[in-house]
Amino acid sequence: MNLNKMYGLFLRHFYLIKSSLPRVLDLIYWPTIQIILWGFISKFFSIYSDYYNNTLGIILTCAILYDILFRSSISFNMLFLEEIWSRNFTNLFIAPLKLKEIIISLIFTALIRTLIGLVPAIILTSPLFGVSILKLGFPLFILFLSLYIFGITLGLFVSSGLMRYGPSFENIAWSSLFLLAPLGCIYYPIEILPEFFKVIAKGLPLVYIFDETRNILINGLVDYENIKPAYLLNLVYLIFGIGLFYLSFLRARIKGTLINMGE
């Protein structure tokens, strides 16, 4: 594994972001708008609802955590789409880069994009709504890491589809997370779901992460045993995602679709 090659690919995408104000604004705009929107919705419920006392803090914190998942997955996909749109996809795989080096570079670049988008939104929540996600303390890192891993895994799935089917698979990149959101039990407990959907939801790491988030915020206690299933599922999906990425690359290379990508 060559660190210089991975660093070179990282720099390529980093300078694309750094040299383009619209790209930076795009990274900041959506999470900021989402946090502000959900902040006002949460504030409404905190005034007019007796469901639980800390409605604002719970819903807004869950919204921020969901955006970690959303940003990480979309950022990974965007890096792949950038290569397609700039017609650099073929050059990427002609370059003396191993697939694992490409994956690792994209993972770290996606992390930078995610943080650029989320940090301003997180900072705004405290003066606007009196909510700070940082009050979660160390458990925040555990929750963040799990959501980031799952986001990257979804990115691997979508990127595999882009390699296999080309730009026509692009719509899946934008819709995949919205399809999972209702089953992820982000803003409500799993008990709300019908029995059939509960079975599916239990196979998603999101359910365990957001359930424990609500537990921490409501009871002030953290139970790491409740988070373990999320990490076990993440491990299974990540291994499968990496395997699918390699398989899609091999099939695309055999069929020659990598050459025509982006044309």
State what each model feature region is.
Residues 1-263:
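Hydrophobic transmembrane alpha-helices and immediately adjacent juxtamembrane helices
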